[in-house]
């Protein structure tokens, strides 16, 4: 038996080794390179997006049948660009494509999240191109910049990414660069001792944004500022339903909200008429450890203060709290970087390389071979980088951690069905799409979605949908359900019919009804507890993430 196992294992290793010979770690994977590349580089609030939208409108006006696309990091930002283009060109000419939503997807002018940008067209705008260096989503920017076949590509980003963009787009016939400066001055507010001005919660001025880095911190500050100033305060953070975020942005822009308290989601391209931006902390938990904000991250946030046409200048200062860690020297650097006075770490960071299924051997490989071939691709790419110093300066290989974790869930779901029913495993193509989809590893949509794709069984997915339709009594519960719903909507657009319905399970219109229900429910729910308030006596805790004040904590056993 030992010999048999050894021979089987050796045969399997030989098979994988033969497959790995077809792994091809190419970077530029297009037959038709761009004729023309334009780089619009500069800090936030320097008019880069305005130039890009003007180029889209001009191109469509001249060549109405050609494909023009915009790709950005957020569904909210894509929607903002979509609405602007509709104003200028009319709704018949403009479409929206994100992972969760499609409006008029066959239109000649498209606003998209970067993962949804068509691979071919005539004019492409790539916004926030420094995201190509993001460990999780950077692969999508790198792939579009290196593989998308457009006659003209316009890339927007900070000055530091100029050499990276010129390397990624080096196959273009012509590259021109335009450097922009801020249209509105930005300054650090200083006191008489030349230290950064500090505001207390009771004197936060109107038209301010307060920055903290956790949902509980944001909610606690929102409650305290509203209570002590009497002003209208709203919260903004990543887990909120996108429509709820859009409502806050619109209300702040219209003057219906005086102060917005938000996480670093504001640094991802959200535009608000902010006059004063107050950091409540400069330290965040990034999923692995607590660390100081990098200068480029802080600059993206600080630069949101002072909007062209609405403010004479932007101001940055500090909000005093009992718990926030503030490093004043960093805030000064954020402002200097946001105004182009100093360079940030972006100049030393690298764009993320990630394989395509074609580079692993295509759909002819078996789904069980995917992780082995990804590892071979990774090794070959690292060898290639070692042999190419210029490439090594701008490119690094993705860790592939999230995709491989997703793969394990999908493989387990597939194996359970194969063992139980002797059916065929999930196809390689579906496996690859699903493991790279915007679906959390812990989400039930990943496991049961994979099983649905194998045998069409909708029983568990129906139970999940039923849970989404109940009335919720906390915002946190709604946020969890909304996340599951957006994953289901993404799944439907990837694997359903042209309308985004899942045959035999649910229509697109029903998904949209559930979304409307959750958003309506979200607007009516009042939280029973407020972060930063003791759950026993209602007094202040030392930090928003603590449930009890010190006195109640010390008396918990008495």
What kind of feature is each model-predicted range?
Residues 286, 291-335:
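Conserved segment of the helicase C-terminal RecA-like domain
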Residues 46, 51, 60, 66-85, ...:
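Conserved Walker A/P-loop ATP-binding site and its immediately adjacent core
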Residues 163-204:
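Interdomain hinge/linker at the junction between the two RecA-like core domains of SF2 helicases
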Residues 80, 85-120:
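Inter-Walker segment of RecA-like/P-loop motor cores
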Residues 234-235, 240-263:
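Conserved helicase ATPase core of P-loop NTP-dependent helicases/translocases
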Residues 114-154:
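SF2 helicase catalytic motif II
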Residues 66-81, 154-156, 202-226, 233-236, ...:
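Conserved strand-helix element at the start of the C-terminal RecA-like helicase core
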Residues 1-19, 29-30, 353-558:
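Non-catalytic terminal extensions of ATP-dependent helicases
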């Amino acid at each position: 038996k030992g010999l048999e196992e050894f021979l089987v294992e050796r045969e399997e290793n030989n098979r994988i080794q033969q497959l790995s010979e077809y792994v091809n770690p190419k970077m530029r994977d297009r037959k038709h390179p761009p004729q023309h590349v334009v780089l619009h580089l500069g800090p936030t609030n320097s008019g880069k997006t305005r130039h890009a939208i003007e180029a889209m409108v001009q191109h469509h006006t001249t060549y109405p049948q050609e494909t023009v696309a915009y790709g950005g990091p957020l569904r909210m930002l894509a929607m903002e660009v979509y609405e602007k283009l509709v104003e200028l060109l009319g709704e018949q000419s403009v479409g929206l494509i994100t992972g969760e939503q499609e409006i008029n997807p066959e239109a000649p002018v498209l606003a998209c999240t970067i993962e949804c940008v068509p691979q071919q067209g005539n004019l492409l705008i790539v916004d926030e191109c420094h995201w190509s260096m993001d460990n999780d989503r950077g692969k999508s920017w790198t792939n579009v910049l290196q593989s998308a076949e457009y006659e003209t590509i316009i890339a927007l980003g900070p000055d530091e990414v100029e050499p990276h963009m010129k390397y990624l787009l080096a196959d273009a016939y012509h590259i021109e660069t335009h450097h922009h400066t801020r249209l509105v001055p930005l300054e650090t507010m200083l006191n008489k001792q030349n230290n950064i001005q500090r505001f207390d919660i009771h004197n936060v001025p109107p038209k301010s944004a307060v920055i903290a880095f956790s949902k509980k911190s944001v909610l606690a500050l929102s409650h305290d500022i509203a209570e002590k100033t009497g002003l209208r305060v709203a919260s903004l953070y990543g887990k909120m339903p996108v429509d709820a975020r859009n409502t806050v942005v619109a209300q702040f822009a219209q003057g219906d909200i005086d102060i917005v308290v938000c996480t670093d989601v504001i640094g991802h391209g959200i535009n608000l008429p902010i006059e004063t931006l107050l950091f409540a902390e400069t330290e965040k938990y990034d999923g692995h450890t607590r660390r100081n904000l990098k200068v480029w991250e802080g600059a993206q946030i600080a630069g949101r203060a002072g909007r062209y046409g609405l403010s004479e200048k932007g101001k940055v200062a500090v909000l005093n709290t009992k718990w926030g860690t503030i490093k004043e020297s960093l805030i000064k650097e954020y402002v200097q970087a946001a105004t182009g006075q100093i360079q940030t770490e972006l100049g030393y960071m690298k764009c993320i390389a990630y394989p395509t299924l074609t580079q692993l051997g295509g759909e002819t490989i078996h789904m069980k071979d995917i992780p082995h071939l990804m590892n071979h691709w990774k090794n070959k790419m690292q060898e290639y980088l070692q042999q190419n110093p210029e490439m090594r300066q701008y490119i690094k290989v993705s860790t592939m951690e999230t995709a491989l974790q997703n793969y394990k869930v999908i493989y387990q779901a597939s194996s359970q069905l194969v063992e139980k029913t002797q059916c065929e495993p999930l196809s390689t193509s579906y496996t690859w799409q699903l493991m790279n989809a915007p679906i959390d590893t812990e989400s039930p949509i990943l496991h049961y979605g994979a099983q649905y794709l194998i045998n069409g069984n909708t029983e568990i997915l129906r139970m999940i949908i039923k849970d989404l339709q109940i009335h919720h009594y906390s915002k946190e519960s709604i946020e969890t359900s909304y996340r599951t719903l957006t994953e289901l909507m993404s799944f439907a657009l990837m694997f359903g019919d042209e309308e985004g319905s899942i045959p035999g399970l649910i229509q697109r219109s029903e998904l949209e009804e559930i979304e409307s229900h959750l958003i309506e429910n979200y607007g009516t729910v009042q939280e029973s507890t407020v972060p930063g308030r003791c759950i026993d006596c209602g007094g202040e805790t030392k930090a928003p993430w603590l449930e009890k004040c010190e006195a109640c904590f010390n008396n918990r056993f008495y």
